[in-house]
C-alpha cells in the first residue's frame, strides 16, 4: 500500500485525489482518536483550512502518529497551530529522539535509524511518504528535539486563501 502510494506520488501527474479546502483540525482530531493521542488546538480559536488532497494529508498525519507510537515510551501529543501563512501540525513523542546527524536521512525511502529493525513494524517508507505529501502540497516536514526528551515532527502547509 505504501509502496504503491510512493510510486504514484513520484509520478506527480498521477491522479491521487481531488484538491479541496481541508479542515486540518478535524482531520487531526480523527487521526488522534484512532491512536489515543492528545490533541491541542488551543492556539487556534477558529478553524484551520489548507488547500490539498484530503486522503494524502490524512495519510501524512497518520504516518507521523504511527511513527510516534512505534518509537514512543509515553504519551503522544499533537498540536495544530497557525504560523503566519502556514498551518503547522506538530506530532511529539517521548521516545529516544532522533540524533541530529540523522534528521534528514530519516526522510529517505527505506532508511531506518540504527537499531530500528529490531522494533516491530515499518519498512522505512512512512516518513519518506510524509515528505513527499508535504512537497506535493508546497509544504515541508522536519524533525526537532522535544523538550523533556523525544522528538517532534513538524508538518507545515500553506493555509487556504480566505474566501
Regions found by a protein language model. Give the residues of each.
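Short beta-strand/loop element within the Bergerat-fold HATPase_c
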Residues: 75-85
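Short alpha-helical Gxxx[C/S/T] motif in the catalytic ATP-binding
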Residues: 126, 130
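Conserved micro-motifs of the catalytic ATP-binding
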Residues: 11-17, 49-52
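Short conserved segment of the HATPase_c
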Residues: 98-110
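Acidic ATP/Mg2+-coordinating residue in the GHKL
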Residues: 93
Amino acid at each position: 500500500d505504501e509502496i504503491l502510494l510512493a510510486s504514484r506520488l513520484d509520478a506527480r501527474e498521477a491522479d491521487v485525489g481531488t484538491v479541496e479546502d481541508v479542515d486540518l483540525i478535524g482531520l487531526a482530531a480523527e487521526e488522534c482518536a484512532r491512536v489515543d493521542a492528545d490533541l491541542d488546538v488551543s492556539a487556534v480559536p477558529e478553524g484551520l483550512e489548507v488547500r490539498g488532497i484530503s486522503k494524502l494529508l490524512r495519510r501524512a498525519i497518520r504516518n507521523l502518529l504511527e511513527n510516534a507510537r512505534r518509537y514512543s515510551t509515553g504519551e503522544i501529543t499533537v498540536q495544530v497551530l497557525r504560523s503566519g501563512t502556514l498551518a503547522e501540525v506538530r506530532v511529539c513523542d517521548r521516545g529516544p529522539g532522533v540524533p541530529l546527524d540523522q534528521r534528514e536521512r530519516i526522510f529517505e525511502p527505506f532508511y531506518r535509524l540504527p537499531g530500528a529493525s529490531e522494533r516491530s513494524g515499518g519498512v522505512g517508507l512512512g516518513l519518506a511518504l510524509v515528505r513527499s505529501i508535504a512537497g506535493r502540497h508546497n509544504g515541508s516536514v522536519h524533525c526537532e528535539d522535544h523538550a523533556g526528551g523525544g522528538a517532534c515532527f513538524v508538518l507545515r502547509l500553506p493555509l487556504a486563501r480566505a474566501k
